[in-house]
Design a protein with these regions (language model features):
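NAD(P)-dependent Rossmann-like dehydrogenase/reductase catalytic/cofactor-binding core
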Residues: 262-323
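Rossmann-fold NAD(P) dinucleotide-binding segment
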Residues: 53-62, 70-89
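C-terminal substrate-binding/catalytic lobe of Rossmann-fold NAD(P)-dependent oxidoreductases
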Residues: 3, 14-15, 22-54, 149-285
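Glycine-rich Rossmann-fold phosphate-binding loop(s) that bind the pyrophosphate
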Residues: 9
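Rossmann-fold NAD(P)-binding glycine/threonine-rich loop
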Residues: 90-114
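General beta-strand structural signal in soluble alpha/beta enzymes
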Residues: 88-89, 114-118, 144, 167-168
């Protein structure tokens, strides 16, 4: 039985608790939080304060870290990896090499295993980009996200004066995807690949015209995209736009000779982004513990781990039933 601790209990931590119920070879030791444990409403797991984590060291095989990539994981993953095997979902792509190097050093010094940057992007999408480019080296890879809720863009909307609440959807340009699948070679801009759709609730007396202008001209978020804005009531937003669906496509178009076109496509359609991401983390937590049991200490990404380590099924059965 693999003994698991959840570190942090937001949407992702809650998703890990759900996922562990579907994996009978795993047991949840508890949730560890910086909040007062008695205020944390879990789905049944015992909540402890983070200060109690080291006290439980002998009862935990792996910690699944469920904090954010901006401020939590750059500190928590190296810190906790001094004492435990760890898995995180660090997703700041540009900083992954730096994060890996820091965690790898600590993991090797302390004889631990840490699997970083798991999830679906980075994670499963990363694997599919690697497979596609290795198999069809003469080609182009495209990644499309959505349709789904972007938490970062929704937060940016909510920071605008006059907006009481908001949800933003990232929508892939399906026409472009179909043209690429048909073999067209396209030079694509940011605006070509994705659309943005905003549902906003205005505060009383807010200037709708000014707010619309502020949204469509916001650099790094909306200025480079075709953006549609809907003003709705809080009731409608709560009813129709508070879920966390997401998904995306990795598309690789290539050739095996001058006249033979080949397309590799991988899709996700998710009703809950955090619950799916959590399920990926749990599978890689199993791999993490297995690598630790083999004394293969250090940091790993999805590129480094053989698929057999993810499955609860023994490799002989995998060869017989899945190969």
């Amino acid at each position: 039985m693999i003994r698991v601790a959840i570190i942090g209990y937001g949407n992702l931590g809650r998703g890990v608790e759900f996922a562990l119920r579907q994996n009978p070879d795993m047991n949840l030791v508890g949730v560890f939080t910086r909040r007062a444990p008695e205020t944390v409403e879990t789905q049944g797991a015992t909540a402890y304060h983070m200060d109690d984590l080291l006290v439980k060291k002998g009862e935990i095989d792996v910690c699944i870290l469920c904090g954010g990539s901006a401020t939590d994981l750059p500190v928590q993953t190296p810190e906790i990896t001094q004492y435990f095997n760890t898995v995180d979902s660090f997703d700041t792509h540009a900083k992954i090499p730096e994060h890996f190097a820091k965690v790898d050093k600590i993991a090797k010094e302390n004889k631990q295993v840490s699997v970083i940057s798991t999830g679906w992007d980075p994670g499963l999408f990363s694997l599919n980009r690697l497979y596609a480019q290795s198999i069809l080296p003469q080609g182009e890879t495209y990644t499309f996200w959505g349709k789904g809720v972007s938490q970062g863009h929704s937060d940016a909307l909510r920071r605008i004066d006059g907006i009481a609440d908001a949800t933003q959807y990232t929508i892939p340009n399906t026409e472009i995807i179909e043209r690429l699948k048909a073999g067209e070679k396209l030079e694509l801009t940011t605006r070509d690949k994705h659309l943005r759709e905003c549902f906003i609730v205005l505060e009383a007396g807010a200037d709708e015209v000014a707010i619309r202008e502020e949204i469509v001209t916001m650099p790094n978020y909306f200025a480079d995209y075709d953006t549609t804005i809907h003003v709705i009531s809080q009731e409608e937003l709560n009813k129709n736009h508070k879920a966390a669906p997401h998904g995306g496509t990795v598309l690789h178009t290539g050739v095996t000779n001058e006249s033979t076109k080949q397309v590799i496509e991988y899709n996700l359609h998710l009703d809950s982004n955090p619950e799916f991401t959590a399920s990926v983390l749990v599978a890689y937590a199993r791999a993490c513990v297995r690598l630790a049991n083999e004394n293969q200490f250090g940091a790993y990404t999805v590129f480094d781990i053989a698929p057999k380590y993810l499955s609860p099924i023994d490799v002989e059965t995998l060869r017989k039933e899945l190969l």
